[in-house]
Structures are given as structure tokens and as C-alpha cells.
From Swiss-Prot:
GO terms for biological process: angiogenesis; cardiac cell fate determination; cardiogenic plate morphogenesis; cell migration involved in gastrulation; cellular response to leukemia inhibitory factor; common bile duct development; embryonic foregut morphogenesis; embryonic heart tube development. This is Transcription factor SOX-17. It comes from Homo sapiens. Acts as a transcription regulator that binds target promoter DNA and bends the DNA. Binds to the sequences 5'-AACAAT-'3 or 5'-AACAAAG-3'. Modulates transcriptional regulation via WNT3A. Inhibits Wnt signaling. Promotes degradation of activated CTNNB1. Plays a key role in the regulation of embryonic development. Required for normal development of the definitive gut endoderm. Required for normal looping of the embryonic heart tube. Plays an important role in embryonic and postnatal vascular development, including development of arteries. Its main location: nucleus. Pfam families: HMG_box, Sox17_18_mid. The keyword Transcription applies. Keywords: Activator, Disease variant, DNA-binding, Nucleus, Transcription, Transcription regulation, Wnt signaling pathway.
């Protein structure tokens, strides 16, 4: 069944073909006029195979003549006729199977049976040397198609890894689900935020005071943490000593007085006994940062202080000076309050105000306070019978102020 427009299409085509030579004749001889006509198109198509076939055959013959084959060895001489015989006997076998059978048969032959073929191969080799004295064996290069296939395979394999990485978290979620592991949600870290090693223990110790746990909460904003700008000196975030930050409950001095401390150290040049004391050091000397000897022996018990005995509240005073030695810089944010040890909050630049706030009635009570045995200081109980003269009023006031600062730190509700 033909379409109704078929006749029209054929008429238009015939009219165009008949009008084309007239138009070309009016235009005159043009180099491209013959190619536009159907006759010229047929001529070009007919001449192309003829012209292309002749050079192709000549090039093939020249290529075949330029390529020199290697002389056959003894096995090739024997297999040339034997392959034809096996192919006639087994027409259905593949050439690879025939090659396997020929190899087994050649190995099964004895040297006497191989000798005529070896002699024939030697003759062909000598003849080949005479015919082609400058012959040099050049092995064939592998086809570029195989090499391109290998390259494309490796290229596609290399592209598979970026595609797998481009899957994003969804691909990771599928992989984690397949392994039976839990995939973390976006926007939250997979684990608790890391803290410096010298701060992790202090946070864990101070959580017993009732502060909320800090390890499970991420930062609310992408800004830097306030802890990043703090001086990482361990002296600033020193581990709390036993008694600096009590866990809970009220602190009673009766329990401290019942504590059986270590025996009193022997008398010597470094640990003198009780005796007449010289005039005490000045107030700026007590409020200044302690030296190495002051830290170990105390301001009153060090050899440089006159050889006097050390009083009991000196460890607290040393601890306060250590915290005052590393204040946060002006551009650094203050650390969280629960991360700080108990600070006295006193300013050494105002000794007059400190002396005015001291209650002299509390001084004798704090003198009987037991010192820490781990600090290596002399141990004095409440029954040691220590009597200080009234001439040491300034020293007593400073010590009492330091003790009251520690006392009010231990009692935040007072």
C-alpha cells in the first residue's frame, strides 16, 4: 500500500533532476557542478573503489615483500605436513586443539625420528642467511586495540572510586548499615569533643560538684571554643588537691584534727625546731610570687627566711600564688567556672583592704589547721601548744586573710 503523496514526490524528484542540467548549463563550467548532478555522483562513487583498490593492493604487496619471515625450525618443518594430515582426519577440531596434539606428538618422537627435520631446518637457516645477509629479527608490536582496551578498563576502574566517593553520606550510610554499624547523623560529631590531656581529668573531677556533664554536648556555634585561647600551662589548670574542691557536704575541723599525720621530721639545718623567731618578713615579700625555696619550705620555714618554723597554712598560700602567677590575658576568654580550682580572688596590690577585713579571732583557729602531709611541710596538730607573740600582727593578719580566702572558697554559701 503506497501513500497518496508518493506520486507527487516522484514527480517533484524527476522535475528537479531534469531542471538541474539546464541550471548548470546556464551557470557555466564550475568545478563543483559535476559533483552535484546525479550522473557525476555515480561516476565519483564508481571510480572511488577502482582507484582505492589499486593502491591498496600495491601497498599490501609491497608490505608483504618488505616483511621477511623467519626460517622455520625443525618442529615447524615437521608440523607443516602433520597439521594437514590431522586436519583431514579431524575436520571438527579447532586449530588450538590441533596444536596441542602436534606438540604431544613431537615430544613423543625420538632423536632418530627428529633428525631429518632438524637437518632440513638447518638447511633452510643457511639459505635464509644467504638470501638476506642483513636480516635482523624485529618482533611484531602488539595491536593498539588491545592496549587501548586495557587503558580504558583501568580508566573506568579509576573513575569508579570518585563516583563511589561522590555518593556522599548516603553511600557511607549504606556501607555502615551493611556492616551492622550505626551511622552518625549529620550536624553532630560522631564522638565526644576532644579535650587537652591536662584538662580532661579536671573536668571529670569537678563534675561531682553538680555541674552538668560537658563531654556529651557539642559547641553551639562553629566559633572557636573559649578553651582554645587559654594558656595550656598545667599550672593554670592544676589538678585539684584533696580538700581544695570538696565533693559534697560540710567540712568539719574536728575530722581534720583527728587525722593522724606522719611523724615530725628530725631536727637539722633544713628543718629547725621551735625557737626564738626574728622579725618577720615584710608584707610585699609575702605577697610576691614564691621562689623555688618558698614553694618547698614555705615563706617562714625556708633557710632564707631566718630559719624559723613553717606555719600550717602556707600550702594554701602557695597554691593561691600559683594561680595568680598565670592570669588569663586581656584578649583571652575566661575558662568555665567549673574548670577552675578554688581561687581566693585576692589582689596583692591592695594589702590595706586585706588587713582591714581580717578577723583576729579566727587566727588561732586556723593555726591549728593540719597541713597537707604530701607537701613535705612540718605537721602541727591542735594540741602542739604553739603560742605566737603579739609582735607578729602583720604576718598573722596576712596568714589569716589567706586562710579566710580558702575558708570562704570551701563554703560557697557563706
Amino acid at each position: 500500500m503506497s501513500s497518496p503523496d508518493a506520486g507527487y514526490a516522484s514527480d517533484d524528484q524527476s522535475q528537479t533532476q531534469s531542471a538541474l542540467p539546464a541550471v548548470m548549463a546556464g551557470l557555466g563550467p564550475c568545478p563543483w557542478a559535476e559533483s552535484l548532478s546525479p550522473i557525476g555522483d555515480m561516476k565519483v562513487k564508481g571510480e572511488a573503489p577502482a582507484n582505492s583498490g589499486a593502491p591498496a593492493g600495491a601497498a599490501g604487496r609491497a608490505k608483504g615483500e618488505s616483511r621477511i619471515r623467519r626460517p622455520m625450525n625443525a618442529f615447524m618443518v615437521w608440523a607443516k605436513d602433520e597439521r594437514k594430515r590431522l586436519a583431514q582426519q579431524n575436520p571438527d577440531l579447532h586449530n588450538a586443539e590441533l596444536s596441542k596434539m602436534l606438540g604431544k606428538s613431537w615430544k613423543a618422537l625420538t632423536l632418530a625420528e627428529k633428525r631429518p627435520f632438524v637437518e632440513e631446518a638447518e638447511r633452510l637457516r643457511v639459505q635464509h642467511m644467504q638470501d638476506h645477509p642483513n636480516y635482523k629479527y624485529r618482533p611484531r608490536r602488539r595491536k593498539q586495540v588491545k592496549r587501548l582496551k586495557r587503558v580504558e578498563g583501568g580508566f573506568l576502574h579509576g573513575l569508579a572510586e570518585p563516583q563511589a566517593a561522590a555518593l556522599g553520606p548516603e553511600g557511607g550510610r549504606v556501607a555502615m548499615d551493611g556492616l551492622g554499624l550505626q551511622f552518625p547523623e549529620q550536624g553532630f560529631p560522631a564522638g565526644p569533643p576532644l579535650l587537652p590531656p591536662h584538662m580532661g581529668g579536671h573536668y571529670r573531677d569537678c563534675q561531682s560538684l553538680g555541674a552538668p556533664p560537658l563531654d556529651g554536648y557539642p559547641l553551639p556555634t562553629p566559633d572557636t571554643s573559649p578553651l582554645d585561647g587559654v594558656d595550656p600551662d598545667p599550672a593554670f589548670f592544676a589538678a585539684p588537691m584533696p580538700g581544695d574542691c570538696p565533693a559534697a557536704g560540710t567540712y568539719s575541723y574536728a575530722q581534720v584534727s583527728d587525722y593522724a599525720g606522719p611523724p615530725e621530721p628530725p631536727a637539722g639545718p633544713m628543718h629547725p625546731r621551735l625557737g626564738p623567731e626574728p622579725a618577720g618578713p615584710s608584707i610585699p615579700g609575702l605577697l610576691a610570687p614564691p621562689s623555688a625555696l618558698h614553694v618547698y619550705y614555705g615563706a617562714m620555714g625556708s633557710p632564707g627566711a631566718g630559719g624559723g618554723r613553717g606555719f600550717q597554712m602556707q600550702p594554701q598560700h602557695q597554691h593561691q600564688h600559683q594561680h595568680q602567677h598565670h592570669p588569663p590575658g586581656p584578649g583571652q576568654p575566661s575558662p568555665p567556672p567549673e574548670a577552675l580550682p578554688c581561687r581566693d580572688g585576692t589582689d596583692p596590690s591592695q594589702p590595706a583592704e586585706l588587713l582591714g577585713e581580717v578577723d583576729r579571732t579566727e587566727f588561732e583557729q586556723y593555726l591549728h589547721f593540719v597541713c597537707k602531709p604530701e607537701m613535705g611541710l612540718p605537721y602541727q596538730g591542735h594540741d602542739s601548744g604553739v603560742n605566737l607573740p603579739d609582735s607578729h600582727g602583720a604576718i598573722s593578719s596576712v596568714v589569716s586573710d589567706a586562710s579566710s580566702a580558702v575558708y570562704y572558697c570551701n563554703y560557697p554559701d557563706v
